[in-house]
Amino acid sequence: MSDYKFTLNLPETEFPMRGNLANREPEMLERWTKDGLYQQIRDSRIGRTPFILHDGPPYANGSIHIGHSVNKILKDIIVKSKTMSGFDAPYVPGWDCHGLPIELKVEQKVGKPGQKISAAEFREECRKYAAEQVNGQREDFIRLGVLGDWQNPYLTMDFSTEANIVRSLSKVIESGHLHKGVKPVHWCTDCGSALAEAEVEYEDKTSPAIDVAFVAADSKAVAAKFGVSDYSHPVSMVIWTTTPWTLPANRALSLSPELDYSLVEFEKDGVTQALILAEVLVESCLTRYNVESHTVLGSAKGAAFELVRFNHPFLDFDVPAILGDHVTTDAGTGIVHTAPGHGQDDFVVGQKYGLEVANPVGDNGVYKPDTEYFAGQHVFKANDNVVALLREKSALLNHVAYRHSYPHCWRHKTPIIFRATPQWFISMDNHGLRTQALKEIEQTQWIPDWGQSRIEKMVENRPDWCISRQRTWGVPITLFVNRETEELHPDSVSLMERVASRIEQQGIQAWWDLDAAELLGDEAEQYRKVTDTLDVWFDSGSTFSSVVAARPEFHGHGVDLYLEGSDQHRGWFMSSLMISTAMNGKAPYKQVLTHGFTVDGKGRKMSKSIGNVIAPQTVTNKLGADILRLWVAATDYSGEMTVSDEILNRSADAYRRIRNTARFLLANLNGFEPAKDLVAVEDMVALDRWVVRRAAALQQEIIEAYEQYNFHIVTQKLMQFCSVELGSFYLDIIKDRQYTAKQEGHARRSCQSALYLISEAMVRWIAPILSFTADEVWQLLPGERDAYVFTQEWYQGLKSVTLATDLSDDYWQQLLTVRNEVNKVIEQARRDKRIGGSLEAEVTLFADAALTEQLTHIGDELRFVLLTSEAKVLPLADATSEAVETELASLKLLVASSTAEKCERCWHHREEVGTIEAHPTLCTRCVTNIEGDGEVRLFA
């Protein structure tokens, strides 16, 4: 055999079977960086149609988690596939760099601004900290194989971006959308300042829980809504609250529109009255009020009482009943005391009804001098006095001490209050922002499509946007306000441009360093500088203008796609929509794609306490980034994305299937030079032409799936092709021809040409997803080529050629089905020890007339398709009793062990082995392939 071994065309490649991705990928990254790969891609697309995916900036704090990885990998797949489709698709990653979490981290290191460190020094420390965080996250993102302008990302703290954020605000102001108002915030009376959510801790506290009656301004009319006519006793709505001190600020009573309310009459202490209570809470309430017997006079929905007036229990005005979604029946009466100046829900519903945002409480937690009854009292100490006054006014139905969870200041560990403070707002309705935003939502493509109704509901119901914050590390609201009238300076827009020019040179500190007289001259004494900073959502929400419109690589082209997690309907998608519509009257994006959150194998959120966190760094260090990328691509991102070690191991198994296919292709292109060896598709063996045709059709399906962002369909089709059409059929069949045919003969070159065309196409199909592996394959493909697959376009060499004499795709599909049936019978014969390998088998196919015509069409080459040494086709009626039935009614099979000698070179059992004097151990075909012109194959 050794003499003939060297006449075989054995596969050979440097492409290793094991990916060893964890070690090899970093080496590839080094080469990508050294070669300036991203710039090579940019250069290859100069002048092409732009496609702009704008990166929603992650927050520059902490390490990246699996959700970050999903997001960046999805973006990278899209950018690479769009580039492959010929677009100029730059990717500029960004980071959100201002805001409270960074302030808190820096506070822990250097103390609060204004105490141990000046505000200017504090901002500089925040800038340094954010830069460190960006550097750490950047390395992790690069490790994932994400290509982008990593050396020149956008940061919201870049001086130029900070300046452009100010310019965006000036355009919003110029369009008339800014107004000043008040909004309740967490307020620490010990700090004398507002607290952000992150500065609030919840501890148990004992508070007075009271039930208070608000008597109807017109009891008879209210009773009539319950179907009770000419009612002569007082009718009251009852609220339950644990903050009696907020009652001076009460401006409404909130009911749930669809909840059933009862009118309940009873007599107590000689007085007959009727109370309005939620139907499901009547019994528990009356038990609290020590009412022994009562009569239900009627029932009505909450919606019936909208804008009906009720008297304040101790102040000389009445308040409306209003409707709110925040009303529940978990506790209390089903009617909520509403003080817009002292609660977020109260404020939101108050905005809807145009209620006064009353704030009788000063910075120090003491009632202001004009507060009737309680002026000069601290709110918590006033609780008892409020209760006493209610008792005196006969409005108190119940009073108990109540233990509950209550917000406390994280620094002082003392209870805090909600308190309305002056803030800056973008109005939703003063200049039609809400209406226009809803129109723009309709013009945008939302993927998945339920995203549209979700953001529509949010826009329909959202209050004005409070854009001001009382923070140190943020872009300043660069306004001058008249000290007497509180009006903006009439030249605010031009003044903001002058400030922006300074910020462009010196950063946001330029605002705090600015002496008003430098810009206002003699007017400086009449105006004060606003010291508030912008909500960080304004920073990121304006990047379509501050970054995309400003950077040259975007060519002034608008954004095509925003892509973030599904929580961003409320976040970045919303803030971007509001700012763009306020500035330009249109949405900042054409498409918005959202992906679900990552959960573990049991559907639980990632949690350190549960111990189910999958860190992307761990995955890349153990399995490699391509495995993580394949998991992301193969998962339907429209819902929750399930990940676990087991799931990632399954991805690794799928990866091996693709890698093994690539290795087979490369190994069998050994010695193939496309420039001289490529066989035209129309001249190929029929089976080769069929597989090229299948690949061409598949390429169209894959491109379409990429276009529709259906990456899980890309991976499904790729796996199907590798496993079934190639792995189980084509590659299996051609091994004999590839290894044993004449090296330079048509039969082999036809096969190699098909493998080459498939390889050229497949390396491009996988490049957006399996980027490292695609690069590895690309470097080993034969023929002259550019340095990187990522600068290429979809392969144009796949031709869907069908000759008149060709067998149809249905024909080959039928042969695949027949072959599967033959394999089952051969496998059983092997288990029964009747044969060894399939080449020891001779198979007789008993087929009906139609199937016989198909099977005999390819003559003796049928045996090559079936991988047997002999294949005979006989009429189905001739089937012997030993013939095995198959799943095809038209086919029965009989397998026997060949009695012919085995060819030493090709291992086929042939009658002529031993009859050729010069080569007694070979078959005629092998002799032809060694010494003659090579065998002729027409079909397989």
Swiss-Prot record:
SUPFAM superfamilies per record: Anticodon-binding domain of a subclass of class I aminoacyl-tRNA synthetases, Nucleotidylyl transferase, ValRS/IleRS/LeuRS editing domain
PROSITE patterns: AA_TRNA_LIGASE_I
Compartment(s) of residence: Cytoplasm
Main location (coarse class): cytoplasm
Signal peptide positions on this chain: none
GO cellular component terms, A-Z: cytosol
Keyword tags: Aminoacyl-tRNA synthetase, ATP-binding, Cytoplasm, Ligase, Metal-binding, Nucleotide-binding, Protein biosynthesis, Zinc
Family membership noted in the UniProt record: Belongs to the class-I aminoacyl-tRNA synthetase family. IleS type 1 subfamily.
Protein name: Isoleucine--tRNA ligase
Origin species: Shewanella baltica (strain OS155 / ATCC BAA-1091)
Taxonomic lineage of the native organism: Bacteria, Pseudomonadati, Pseudomonadota, Gammaproteobacteria, Alteromonadales
